[in-house]
Amino acid sequence: MKILVLNSGSSSLKYQVIDMESEKVLAKGNFERIGQARSFLTHKVNGEKHKFEIKAENHEEAIRFVLKRLINENYGVMKSLDELIGIGHRVVHGGEKFTEPVIITDEVIDTIKECTELAPLHNPSAILGMEACKRIVPNIKMVAVFDTAFHQTIPKERYLYPIPYEYYEKYGIRKYGFHGTSHKYVAYRVAELMEKDVKDLKIINCHLGQGGSICAIQNGKSVDTSMGLTPLGGIVMATRSGDLDPSVLTYLMERHELNAREMETILNKESGVYGVSGVSVDFRDIEVEAASGDKNSQRALDIFHDSVAGYVAKYMVAMGGADVITFTAGVGEKGQDSRQEICNRLKYFGIKLDEKHNQEIKGDEDKVSPEDSSIPVYVVPTNEELMIARETKKCIEEGERK
């Protein structure tokens, strides 16, 4: 019982084959530079990496090559593609159209295309992957799993923006939220670690990577999240500004004669901790510079830590407390100092970390708070691919029962 998980980028294709009985990854890889003169596939199976150079003009050629490798005598994990019970596609934006994973049909693809305005950089790539698979393996069921779907349970008073209501009605301008697959995985996983039902918990999950978002989860459902209409909103990130006074945009656009696209580039690619520090998009580099006395690097980290702690505090108010706080993704899993600094800012609430144990946890799964912390704090490495595989399996099985 195997599922292929696909994440199609504009010029890349990431994949995993997961055995659903053991939930182990049998093979995974990354196809890069699709559509360019030289394309490369890194394929990992049985702990060994294999690299291939092949010219893939488009996603269909890349997927055909990957599927051949998966049933290859030397590099494969299946005798035939018939062993696949389904293919799960990661889709960034489902708008208000999709509140849960769906079996992919021509009608579903058309509806996803309607959401492209909300995710012009991501949805078209996912569609390419779906359409290619429909041509190559038309008999294998496919499921679309949306990053935004988990947040469709956020109440209206929290997802509406305080601008004229007609903009929501005409253009769908509202908070959608992202990283939903990660937030859902971590919520269910930490409930397992605590030996409790996720429906009995109030969880605040901090997904901190190059991009980052905080999510308030109550009764297993998202009730608020920091990202908004796009992944630009919310906490300060590596190169993204996060929340700021909207007048900053109009001031800079007038002062520097910037158009909307140029302003968007500044906010998405030149801001965040990189913009403040002027050092790097990598938090580790900024930490090194801060430790050596660079004031702007230290300020960048302080702004980031304040930003995350502020959202955690906000969501404790929104839910009337929290039963657990979790850290996940690159910085959340491996940034021991950032975890400590964020929790130090929350000590008013009685939140503490075991400083020694926290420093020992780098990418591992464990509780990092002492027993006298008012709220337990966990590090839970995310696994979006496994969550997509689970959702794909569940969606297919439910469809078969109907």
Listing of model-derived features with the role each one plays in the protein:
Residues S12-A56, G228:
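Short glycine-rich, Thr/Ser-proximal phosphate-binding strand/loop in the N-terminal lobe
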Residues M1-L4:
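Extreme N-terminal starter segment of soluble prokaryotic enzymes
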Residues T265, G272-V276, F283-A318:
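Adenine-nucleotide phosphate-binding core of ATP-dependent small-molecule kinases
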Residues F150-M253:
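Glycine-rich phosphate-binding loop of actin/hexokinase-like ATP-binding domains
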Residues Q218, V223-H256, T265, A329-E360, ...:
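Catalytic phosphate/nucleotide-handling subdomain of diverse soluble enzymes
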Residues L70-H122, V143, A149-R158:
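Short beta-strand-loop/turn "lid" adjacent to the catalytic site in phosphate-handling enzymes
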Residues Q298, D302-A318, D323, G332-K402:
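Internal helix-turn-beta structural module
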Residues R69-L84, V190-D197, V312-D323:
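Phosphate/pyrophosphate-binding loops at sites that engage ATP/ADP/AMP, CoA/4′-phosphopantetheine
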